[in-house]
């Protein structure tokens, strides 16, 4: 498997926009359809906002991947925030620890082909999503 990668900070609302733009560019370079671009950009936007708002900021690692003929993007969002006490509950639509609609984590999971999450109270959260080219 070969990868191309870039790491970006998420410390402001402007950084969330920069993450969206970087993911869009990576999706275009990977040959994603407009639908696949929209899905991965939307998921990235939700996860970047979560890292900024709930995690106090963090980073995203954007990896363009190739496995044989398959091409995809893997995004890993990491923060050192308060963590998520109940991941199963947090993945349900409507759950929010803030003022949002509570669609971020569950929505990101639905928009991805692969999804993993690790979180520990007082240690932070790491969410990794992968979207493969259709």
Each language-model region and where it sits:
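G2-box/ATP-lid motif of Bergerat-fold
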Residues: 54-68, 72
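Glycine-rich/acidic phosphate-handling loop/turn and adjacent ATP-lid/helix
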Residues: 67-101
């Amino acid at each position: 498997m070969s990868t191309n990668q870039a790491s970006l900070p998420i410390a402001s609302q402007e950084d969330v926009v920069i993450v969206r733009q970087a993911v869009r560019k990576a999706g275009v370079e990977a040959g994603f359809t407009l639908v696949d671009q929209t899905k991965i950009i939307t998921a990235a936007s939700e996860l970047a906002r979560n890292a900024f708002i709930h995690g106090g900021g963090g980073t995203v690692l954007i990896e363009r991947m190739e496995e044989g003929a398959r091409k995809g993007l893997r995004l890993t969002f990491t923060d050192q925030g308060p963590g998520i006490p109940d991941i199963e509950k947090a993945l349900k639509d409507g759950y929010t620890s803030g003022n949002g609609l509570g669609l971020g984590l569950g929505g990101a999971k639905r928009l991805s082909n692969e999804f993993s999450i690790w979180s520990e109270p007082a240690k932070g959260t790491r969410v990794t999503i992968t979207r493969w080219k259709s």
